[in-house]
């Protein structure tokens, strides 16, 4: 009998109502806002309300430098969380949110795989509660305000050839990597070369993941540097009066999302900064809540140990104040063979490569 696909397994799963999942980790109803039957947002007041509860053991899952296909950190994280529950330990897992670009690319979704998945499958990998779209909108709001500032006379003296803030989109669109904006009539803006990055690479996404409160996020957004003046001085979002607008757009996005695994293990899924251009870890607020919800909080550091794990220890943990108790390193023969320089890992993994 052939092995069912990940999607078939996910669709055959029996899920708990999200209110029951929240109850399992001690979240009262007033701290949980359902988004349908199987997803919810957690109010940030939970950080204070749960603070007096015992602290869970904090476990980080990382990996050797992965191949383009990924080596299974998420699958291992989910499987470990489910296994803890099988031996009578109350475990919660904490993961980054999926980016739609890689979901439709060679790497695929971010739900795990096989019988170690976070569900609902489609919601997790596409849109979820709209956090990605909120980050996209906030980022592009700042881009629009920057271009409008240039059009309105450039009072700050911004050097048009030294602007570092581009636009973002949660789609792998090669044709938008480098573009020229402001073409057309004079009222259509100042022509200049810019481009699009993917939303997960946005500094606004990194800010979302590192913020400890709404006020902290407001301050961090205001400190974003968008470019430099002709005198070489940095120009910030605060100087463009964009920090408040960005915060309002992202006000719901800062609340962590609650889902579950195939075996009903609670999963906090929040924020998705990349590990190559940012710190590659799920949100600080998600872990500040999750650390008081059971015996173990198991989180994943994105990319390889030299990227996500290094930044987990040196950036995320310093912001959250949480210290890990153990680390799990995922290692595959496929990755080791790929790094030997003798094998090129592509879409199909033929038998001799695995």
Predicted segments — roles?
Residues 1-353:
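Flexible phosphate-sensing "switch/lid" loops adjacent to ATP/NTP-binding sites
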């Amino acid at each position: 009998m052939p092995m069912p696909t990940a999607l078939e397994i996910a669709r055959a799963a029996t899920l708990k109502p999200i209110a029951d999942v929240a109850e399992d980790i001690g979240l009262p109803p007033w701290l949980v806002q359902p988004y349908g039957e199987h997803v919810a947002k957690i109010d940030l007041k939970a950080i204070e309300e749960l603070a007096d509860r015992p602290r869970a053991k904090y476990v980080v899952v990382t990996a050797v430098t992965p191949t383009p296909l990924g080596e299974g950190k998420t699958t291992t994280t989910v499987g470990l969380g489910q296994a803890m529950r099988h031996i009578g330990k109350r475990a919660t897992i904490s993961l980054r949110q999926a980016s739609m670009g890689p979901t439709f690319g060679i790497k695929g979704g971010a739900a795990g795989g096989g019988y170690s998945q976070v569900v609902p499958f489609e919601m997790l990998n596409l849109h979820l509660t709209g956090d990605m779209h909120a980050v996209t909108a906030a980022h592009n709001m700042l881009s629009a305000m920057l271009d409008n500032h240039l059009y309105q006379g450039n009072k700050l003296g911004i050097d048009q050839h030294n602007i570092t803030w581009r636009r973002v989109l949660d789609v792998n669109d090669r044709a938008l990597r480098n573009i020229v904006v402001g073409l057309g009539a004079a009222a259509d803006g100042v022509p200049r070369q810019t481009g699009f990055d993917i939303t997960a690479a946005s500094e606004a996404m990194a800010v979302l993941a590192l913020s400890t409160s709404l006020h902290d996020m407001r301050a961090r957004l205001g400190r974003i540097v968008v470019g430099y003046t002709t005198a070489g001085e940095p120009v910030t979002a605060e100087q463009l009066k964009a920090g408040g607008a960005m915060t309002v757009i992202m006000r719901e996005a800062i609340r962590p999302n609650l889902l579950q695994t195939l075996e009903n293990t609670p999963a906090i899924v929040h924020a998705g900064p990349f590990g190559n251009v940012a710190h590659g870890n799920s949100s600080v607020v998600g872990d500040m809540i999750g650390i008081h919800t059971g015996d173990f909080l198991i989180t994943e550091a994105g990319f390889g140990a030299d990227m996500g794990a290094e930044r987990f220890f040196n950036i995320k943990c310093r912001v959250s104040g949480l210290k890990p108790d153990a680390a799990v390193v995922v290692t595959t023969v496929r990755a080791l063979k790929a790094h030997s320089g003798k094998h090129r890992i592509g879409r199909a993994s033929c038998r001799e490569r695995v």
